[in-house]
Amino acid sequence: MSNRVSTGKMAMAPQESVQPAVLYKLVLFALLMAVVPIGTYFSTLNYLWDGASRCGFPSGLCSTTFAAISAIAAANLILVGYVVVAFREDAASRTGPLPEKKTS
């Protein structure tokens, strides 16, 4: 048999370590990563690169390639934005309010 004795105490729930603002930013950027590149692809395909035949290939191939490059650029901009926001948040948490010196 086991020598362990139950104390009858329930385990304490872990304290909330995830800040709501961090979770909000993560969800926001995840949604942006899902929506913006797809929207960029179809909007540039239909409005910006419509009928682009400057590359020497059939116009459909050129416009889809340019639209895909536009979507990749949009996704990378969102990713860079997330990294910038994360670094700013980290720097702000490190430079919190300084403790006041007590004068006696």
From Swiss-Prot:
Name under which the protein is recorded: Vacuolar ATPase assembly integral membrane protein VMA21
Sequence ranges on the Cytoplasmic membrane side: 1-21, 87-104
A Gene Ontology cellular-component term: ER to Golgi transport vesicle membrane
Subcellular location: Endoplasmic reticulum membrane; Endoplasmic reticulum-Golgi intermediate compartment membrane; Cytoplasmic vesicle, COPII-coated vesicle membrane
Function, as annotated: Required for the assembly of the V0 complex of the vacuolar ATPase (V-ATPase) in the endoplasmic reticulum.
Lumenal side: 43-65
Membrane topology: Multi-pass membrane protein
Motif (Prevents secretion from ER): 101-104
Top-level taxon in the UniProt lineage: Eukaryota
Swiss-Prot/TrEMBL keywords: Cytoplasmic vesicle, Endoplasmic reticulum, Membrane, Transmembrane, Transmembrane helix
Family statement: Belongs to the VMA21 family.
Pfam families in alphabetical order: VMA21
Keyword hit for Membrane: yes
GO terms of biological process kind: vacuolar proton-transporting V-type ATPase complex assembly
Membrane-spanning residues: 22-42, 66-86
Lineage: Eukaryota, Fungi, Dikarya, Basidiomycota, Agaricomycotina
Keyword Ion transport annotated: no
